[in-house]
Amino acid sequence: MSTTEESAKLFADASSVIPGGVNSPVRAFNSVGGTPRFITSAKGCRLTDVDGNQYVDLVCSWGPMILGHAHPAVVEAVQRVAAHGLSFGAPTPSESELAREIIDRVAPVERVRLVNSGTEATMSAIRLARGFTGRAKIVKFSGCYHGHSDALLADAGSGVATLGLPSSPGVTGAAAADTLVLPYNNVAAVEEIFAQFGDEIACVITEASPGNMGTVPPLPGFNAALRRITAAHGALLIVDEVMTGFRVSRSGWYGLDPVDADLFTFGKVMSGGLPAAAFGGTAEVMGRLAPLGPVYQAGTLSGNPVAMAAGLATLRAADDAAYAKLDANADRLVGLIGDALTEAGVTHQIPRAGNMFSVFFGGDPVTDFASAKATETWRFPAFFHALLDAGIYPPPSAYEAWFVSTALDDEAFDRIADALPGAARAAAQAAA
């Protein structure tokens, strides 16, 4: 059993100055209990906390760290650029370089606007879709999380799912009035809502492959059906690749399921672990943005040169061999987890979206938010803590995705393999 004395002290101190002691709710361990670990350093696939405990990292900062932590090429790029200044509030060459890198990887994207977070990216894409179409209503799917702007928190996943809330206090009826929420993976529901409101709907926004109600991949043809329906009604399709973008393939989910959306949003991997994100799409739609057009969007730190350096270094190091390694590591990890749970007699499923996955307990297929919430989530805290105590750091919520990096090595997999039988038994013995 590892000690958490210093983490507990720091959490108490943080709670006196930061609401809940954390700056993103899932970090508080509310859904699994126990003391959040305060991390002091990371290298490769390993995290070290303030108490000196070391963990094999299966969260990867919620996705961005595909190359592992402190990758030499990324660190060198950040240090080199930071030495010349941290922020200028003026254009820099690296902004265009990163935009071009995205355009080269995702064929439908012809123009890119850089922002600071995934929330900004989706919020701005929604505003642009409304400005382009002159319509007000948007369609989103239950359990899909697109950041914490008011209109998009209606029946969202991620931290809202972890907290068991259908939405969030503070989101007014007026803010959500034009948000139409449908069950995920249900083409008939989309067709019905367009039959009713088609000439009022500006856009449909969907996660390319959801990872915020757990990993729940789209059924075959679902995203293509969204493209067909939106095009038929003059609405835009926004595909949110903040999580999947440049993680599940060189071209993100688009590389696995090439549906030509009007707008895409990106984050996480494209910034190499620093705060940056983007949205992009066709030249026609993106041309409505200020200063070319009337749809306003701006940001003091957008295109920050240090974040651009981290993103460019990450994407340029993520070659075909890196993506093959990510897939192989996910295959190996999923196999180990599945074998351990089967051996312990725990009914489970491990849905995949490329090299992302989640662990659901129970036998009914998970295809949407309702079926995700119907799983035996009460088994997850025991499973989580058994792994954590053995030096493995999984996501502290049953509704989050697990992430691998290229840095996972044989020693890390041996440690995981040693920890899993006990964790599986803990899940088997958990009480509802």
Curated annotation (Swiss-Prot):
Keywords recorded for this protein, A-Z: Cytoplasm, Isomerase, Porphyrin biosynthesis, Pyridoxal phosphate
Pathway: Porphyrin-containing compound metabolism; protoporphyrin-IX biosynthesis; 5-aminolevulinate from L-glutamyl-tRNA(Glu): step 2/2
Cytoplasm keyword on record: yes
Catalytic activity: (S)-4-amino-5-oxopentanoate = 5-aminolevulinate
Stretches that traverse the bilayer: none
Family annotation (Pfam families): Aminotran_3
EC number(s) from the headed UniProt entry: 5.4.3.8
Subcellular localization, as worded in the UniProt entry: Cytoplasm
PANTHER family in alphabetical order: GLUTAMATE-1-SEMIALDEHYDE 2,1-AMINOMUTASE, GLUTAMATE-1-SEMIALDEHYDE 2,1-AMINOMUTASE 1, CHLOROPLASTIC-RELATED
Protein name: Glutamate-1-semialdehyde 2,1-aminomutase
